[in-house]
């Protein structure tokens, strides 16, 4: 997430929680630190329970741990030499602005942070960041790696480079990609920061200076932080012209490129090196064709090979644009979709002939900051609706809007057409309260897997929970269907069991017709994230494997599980050399596609 000064958005991710950890040796603990120790300008900092290897003393204390959980001691790292060079004017301006920020921080210290912006909650336990990990090969495997799995599994996540100065939401962290490569019957692992423009500048400055969209931009102090950022930009201390995003949410492999994405910027191309390492190529604008941001969940049509995407703006009209790319990367003209107000549109869906655009009740109202509130607002007076637009429309004049009251789906898992009833069927997880991820709420979060039917003839909609038995309802968030059938009718969805929220205790294989649920649980004190379904070579929809990172909070070890998607039995477990924090979305790049990678 980046500042709301340009297009900003948020990704479907869960919040931090409190965890405990066992004593660790110094060698085991090294992967629990932040990134390398870096020079830092003198400043007043808010005293937090989260400390970092970036600062002295070199210890990382996880907040709100049990009394028998000691501090984790890490070795200080050598300081980087590539610090930002400033002229006399810039040094003077930086000192003055740092002093102003110190005053602002001292003011913020007088007010308690909500849980949704409290670093001691948001990046506690296995939500905390890790160091980069160079490639480690020939990892231990329990069981046998399936012969058909050849390629690399990559997963994105938020991993803040620096200790938060004030408020921090889990979504605010810098992007880090974790990669497990399968080759010659063995597995390797690496993780690297995506070196965004924001990341590179903050690394040079040795401190966080870009505004955090959720953790910091609230009320008058949020406005003050924006003004500080503008002033630093005017003085040449920071340069937002080449992007302010974190690239921490989605991943897509398209036209020979792996793209890391967040809604607040252009995508970043990340290269998978021949030995399984990760290297940031740079900000990718599709050869000069993409001039706006792009949401983190573009869709690749499995039949045509085209990429479909949206871009939304929270400041100026048009608030929403739709576009597509041909398989060779040629972009279509933008289709401007008229909205009355800027709206959070984290995800959307495609069918064979249409794009399905959710216009829901979580909106951006920047004037709320003037009144002391959050700019991310649940608008109870707005009626949620879905727009159905022809995939190849040249404008939005024929978009058909269908109301779907009180429906907020952070993610849409699939959609398809049923011509016999003139309906478009949408599968999504309906979340209540809609803004609970961003704003504190007394109501427990619920995420109900739902079937939404949009009748193109009558303009009416219906919605039903797919799991009809109320006693069997569980929070289902983060997952997918068979990607080879995206936009076509699917029988199964594979979704994270987001319980106890915000942790993920396993995943569910759900029959979308009958509501039957089969669960794979990770076990006591073991949690994971989004399950990735990797289709097999056979003809059955559910033939294949499910890949998921799992972390044991008792042993403080992480692994990659490979689960048979039919039987839900674990076929192999790859033991990882360092901790993998809970994260967001991933994808799999087969060996054949990897061989065609653009470098």
From Swiss-Prot:
Keywords: Abscisic acid biosynthesis, Chloroplast, Dioxygenase, Iron, Metal-binding, Oxidoreductase, Plastid, Stress response, Transit peptide. Its cofactor is Fe(2+). GO terms for cellular component: chloroplast stroma; chloroplast thylakoid membrane. Residues 1-40 form a transit peptide. Pfam families: RPE65. Overexpression of NCED3 results in increased accumulation of abscisic acid and resistance to water stress. This is 9-cis-epoxycarotenoid dioxygenase NCED3, chloroplastic.
């Amino acid at each position: 997430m980046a500042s709301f000064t340009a297009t900003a958005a948020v990704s479907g991710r869960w919040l931090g929680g409190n965890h405990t950890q066992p004593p660790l040796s110094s060698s085991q603990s090294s992967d629990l630190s932040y990134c390398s120790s870096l020079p830092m300008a003198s400043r007043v900092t808010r005293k937090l329970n989260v400390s970092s290897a970036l600062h002295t003393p070199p210890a990382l204390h996880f907040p709100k741990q049990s009394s028998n959980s000691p501090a984790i001691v890490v070795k200080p790292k050598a300081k980087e030499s590539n610090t930002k060079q400033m002229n006399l004017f810039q040094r003077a301006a930086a000192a003055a602005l740092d002093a102003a920020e110190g005053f602002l921080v001292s003011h913020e210290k007088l007010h308690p942070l909500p849980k949704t912006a409290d670093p001691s909650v948001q990046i506690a336990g296995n939500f905390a960041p890790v160091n980069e990990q160079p490639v480690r090969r020939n990892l231990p495997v329990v069981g046998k790696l399936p012969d058909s799995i050849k390629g690399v599994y990559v997963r994105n996540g938020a991993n803040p480079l620096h200790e938060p100065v004030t408020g921090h939401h889990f979504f605010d962290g810098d992007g880090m990609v974790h990669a497990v490569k399968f080759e010659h019957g063995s597995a390797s692992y690496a993780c690297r920061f995506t070196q965004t423009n924001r990341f590179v500048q903050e690394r040079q400055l040795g401190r966080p200076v870009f505004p955090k969209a959720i953790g910091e931009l609230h009320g008058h102090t949020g406005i003050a932080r924006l003004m500080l950022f503008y002033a630093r930009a005017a003085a040449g201390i920071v340069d937002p012209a080449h992007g302010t995003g974190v690239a921490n949410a989605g991943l897509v492999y398209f036209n020979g490129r792996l793209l890391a994405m967040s809604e607040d910027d252009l995508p970043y191309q990340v290269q998978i090196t021949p030995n399984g390492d990760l290297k940031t190529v740079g900000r990718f604008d599709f050869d000069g064709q993409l001039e706006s941001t792009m949401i983190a969940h573009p869709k690749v049509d499995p039949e045509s090979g085209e990429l479909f995407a949206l871009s939304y703006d929270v400041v100026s009209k048009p608030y929403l644009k739709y576009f597509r790319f041909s398989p060779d990367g040629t972009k279509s003209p933008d289709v401007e979709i008229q909205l009355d107000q800027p709206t959070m549109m984290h995800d959307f869906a495609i069918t064979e002939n249409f794009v399905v655009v959710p216009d829901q009740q979580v909106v951006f109202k920047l004037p709320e900051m003037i009144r002391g509130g959050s700019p991310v607002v649940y608008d109870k007076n707005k009626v949620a609706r879905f727009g159905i637009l022809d995939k190849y429309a040249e404008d939005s004049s024929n978009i058909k809007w269908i109301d779907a009251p009180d429906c907020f789906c952070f993610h849409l898992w699939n959609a398809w057409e049923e011509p016999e009833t003139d309906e478009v069927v949408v599968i999504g997880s309906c979340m209540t309260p809609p803004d609970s991820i961003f704003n504190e709420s007394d109501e427990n979060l619920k995420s109900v897997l739902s079937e939404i039917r949009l009748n193109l003839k009558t303009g009416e909609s219906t919605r039903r929970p797919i799991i009809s038995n109320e006693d069997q309802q569980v929070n289902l968030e983060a997952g997918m269907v068979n990607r080879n059938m995206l936009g076509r009718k699917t029988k199964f969805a594979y979704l994270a069991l987001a319980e106890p929220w915000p942790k993920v205790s396993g995943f569910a294989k759900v029959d979308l017709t009958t509501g039957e649920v089969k669960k794979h649980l990770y076990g006591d004190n073991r949690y994971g994230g989004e399950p990735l379904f990797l289709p097999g070579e056979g003809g059955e929809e559910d033939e294949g494997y499910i890949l998921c990172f799992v972390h044991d909070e008792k042993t403080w070890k992480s692994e990659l599980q490979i689960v048979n998607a039919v039987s839900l039995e674990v076929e192999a477990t790859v033991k990882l050399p360092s901790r993998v924090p809970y994260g967001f979305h991933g994808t799999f790049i087969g060996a054949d596609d990897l061989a065609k990678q653009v470098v």
